[in-house]
Amino acid sequence: MNHPKIIIPTKVVVQNDAMHDTTSPGKLITETIPSDRIVDVVIPDELKAVLSEVKTIIWNGPMGNYENGFTEGTLELTKLIADTGAFSLIGGGDSVALIESLGLEQKFGFLSTGGGAMLEYLAQGTLPGIAVLESQE
């Protein structure tokens, strides 16, 4: 997917899906990710230059296989975004919990534990519950 305003990291660490071994370093991939692999850590190095120039950041969910202990990419991205000064909208319970655990809530413009709902609202301009309430006015 190529779009000047949507940035998808190109370097990731992947691991065999069957392993679920958080002690293995995995394998750095800079090409197509094989279908039998899962992303363990997204390396956001290439995002540093871009993030220093943007005015708004929308981020939903952790980077990679966060639930199984692979937190490096998510931690680094969190700190990068916190230091940009850009207005940021962050969605997803894991992302918000991490930001809160680091005490960085004040560095972000908007935090939502409902990441999918946040994205739906941004895309559609409303949510089903809001639409019902608005139609009853």
Residue ranges and their predicted role:
Residues M1-E137:
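Active-site loop-to-helix "anion-binding N-cap" substructures in soluble metabolic enzymes
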